[in-house]
């Protein structure tokens, strides 16, 4: 007998207690973004594949579920990342001059999970700034990312900084790199120096030595001084290191690490990259950086920087308890009781009316008060 209730692997229902916390944190974060002047957008869950993947890397294509549109016969994709959609909205639909701040919150779907226990249906929350090429935008986005994590009750946060321009400068002028690109990035991300030695055989010695050094350039801000002494003294690398120093000095409320081989999303990013970690966990809880090239694919090159996080992961880590205070009301045909319940709900109170024959309360609510009949009518009293 088949189990009709089974869900696909790495897909799960969100039950009331988890859903309540997720919704509370979603509201907190969107309200926070609003105080910074970010406008909410809601891109569609489904787009034609060429639009959905425009300006993105090969890894997003692999994470995107595809299907055929029954109306047009064209291939469509279920979004695996909202950020490219928001870039399309800024470049093609809004088409505003100057700075635009946008934020979003919505489900995405992954063809494969990012990790063994990872969900294939994250709830992605993020914010983006378009139209400012200076480091000030990156500082604001990094500050907002920290504030969002703190709004979720997370503490002891560490920020890891990297820069896509360093690797780009090292690989510039190496036309054969495309053949080994994926293996190179995998070795750098895992800091597998032995694999790097094998992959970089035959490269010019200067570039090879620099690539082998990247996994060792990890630690506090002092790593940047070691990087200046170790990496080639090119203008592009010098500018990238200067930007990392400037960004690191602006961080408040988190410790800073430099990790010059943390290159996840390299194909996507064009400048500073950062990831937030909490103590005791190996995986990042939020990630962001600069991606100036994405809008160009939609016909309008725009400086852009932003961050995103998976709200389900953050909610699982959050110590915040969300158990709503409620008022218990008996079941009674008295019109005065009905009027009292309507008035309380209009004022924002949760009123749970007991149905006939049921006396057990739901654990999801803390009914610390009750409606009782007195001479003056129905009044709220402690329970």
Swiss-Prot record:
Membrane spanning stretches: none
The keyword Cytoplasm belongs to this UniProt entry's keyword annotation: yes
InterPro entries referenced in this protein's UniProt entry, alphabetically: aa-tRNA-synth_II/BPL/LPL (IPR045864), HisRS-like_core (IPR041715), HisRS/HisZ (IPR004516), HisZ (IPR004517)
Pathway field: Amino-acid biosynthesis; L-histidine biosynthesis; L-histidine from 5-phospho-alpha-D-ribose 1-diphosphate: step 1/9
Gene Ontology terms: biological process: histidyl-tRNA aminoacylation; L-histidine biosynthetic process
Compartmental location: Cytoplasm
SUPFAM superfamilies: Class II aaRS and biotin synthetases
Keyword terms of this UniProt record: Amino-acid biosynthesis, Cytoplasm, Histidine biosynthesis
Keyword Cytoplasm assigned: yes
GO molecular function: histidine-tRNA ligase activity
Main location: cytoplasm
Any single Gene Ontology cellular-component annotation: cytoplasm
Function: Required for the first step of histidine biosynthesis. May allow the feedback regulation of ATP phosphoribosyltransferase activity by histidine.
Family: Belongs to the class-II aminoacyl-tRNA synthetase family. HisZ subfamily.
Note, other: This function is generally fulfilled by the C-terminal part of HisG, which is missing in some bacteria such as this one.
Subunit structure: Heteromultimer composed of HisG and HisZ subunits.
Protein name in the entry: ATP phosphoribosyltransferase regulatory subunit
């Amino acid at each position: 007998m088949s189990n009709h209730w089974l869900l696909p692997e790495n897909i799960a229902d969100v039950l009331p207690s988890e859903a309540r916390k997720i919704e509370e944190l979603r509201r907190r974060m969107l309200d926070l973004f609003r105080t910074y002047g970010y406008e909410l957008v809601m891109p569609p869950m489904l787009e034609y594949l060429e639009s959905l993947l425009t300006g993105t890397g090969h890894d997003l294509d692999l994470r995107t579920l595809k299907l055929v549109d029954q109306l047009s016969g064209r291939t469509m994709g279920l979004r695996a990342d909202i950020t490219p959609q928001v870039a399309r909205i800024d470049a093609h639909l809004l088409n505003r001059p100057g700075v635009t701040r946008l934020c979003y919150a919505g489900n995405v779907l992954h063809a494969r999970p990012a990790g063994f226990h990872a969900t294939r249906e994250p709830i992605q929350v993020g914010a983006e700034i378009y139209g400012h090429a200076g480091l000030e935008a990156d500082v604001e986005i990094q500050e907002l990312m920290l504030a969002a994590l703190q709004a979720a009750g997370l503490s002891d946060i560490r920020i890891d900084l990297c820069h896509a321009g360093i690797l780009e400068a090292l690989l510039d002028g190496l036309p054969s790199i495309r053949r080994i690109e994926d293996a190179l990035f995998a070795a750098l991300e895992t800091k597998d120096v032995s694999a790097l030695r094998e992959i970089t055989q035959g490269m010019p010695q200067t570039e090879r030595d620099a690539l082998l050094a990247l996994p060792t350039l990890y630690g506090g801000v002092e790593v940047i001084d070691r990087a200046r002494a170790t990496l080639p003294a090119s203008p592009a690398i010098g500018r990238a290191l200067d930007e990392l120093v400037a960004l690191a000095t602006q961080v408040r409320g988190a410790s800073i690490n430099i990790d010059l081989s943390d290159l996840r999303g390299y194909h996507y990013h064009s400048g500073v990259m950062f990831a937030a970690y909490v103590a005791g966990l190996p995986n990042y809880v939020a990630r962001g950086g600069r991606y100036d090239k994405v809008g160009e694919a939609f016909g309008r090159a725009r400086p852009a920087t932003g961050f995103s996080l998976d709200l389900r992961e953050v909610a699982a880590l959050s110590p915040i308890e969300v158990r709503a205070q409620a008022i218990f009301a008996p079941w009674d045909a008295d019109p005065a009781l009905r009027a009292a319940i309507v008035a309380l709900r209009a004022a924002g109170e949760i009123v749970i009316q007991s149905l006939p024959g049921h006396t057990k309360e739901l654990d999801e609510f803390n009914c610390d008060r009750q409606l009782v009949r007195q001479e003056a009518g129905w009044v709220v009293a402690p329970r």
